[in-house]
Amino acid sequence: MPFAICAPVVSQYAALAALEGPQDCVSEFKAHYLAARNLMCERLDDLDSIFAYQRPDGSYLMFPKILLAEGKDSMAFCKNLLKKGRVSTTPGIAFGPTGESHLRLSFCVPFDEINKAFDRIRALFV
């Protein structure tokens, strides 16, 4: 029995309209994400005894390495961060064994949310 999977037609028309329509919003999103990325990098730099990272060039996600001994178990580290610091992150182990000792952070949130999260992380570990 032949079987094919493709994007729904309505989604294809929506994608075409988005690509052919005004692109002003793309510049605005790019500027916002760059500023948010830079803010998160500054905040991570301030916690360089806790995290090591590489600055992302094409994603709104970061995957810093946890340098603390308790970071070897990323699941436990993230649960502790959620319970004691009220900061939600994704444990690196969720992305496979090489993700252990890392956590995933997203900077597609408002600047005040980034600052609030890092203020809480700082209070917990510094």
Regions found by a protein language model. Give the residues of each.
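PLP-dependent class I/II
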Residues: 1-126
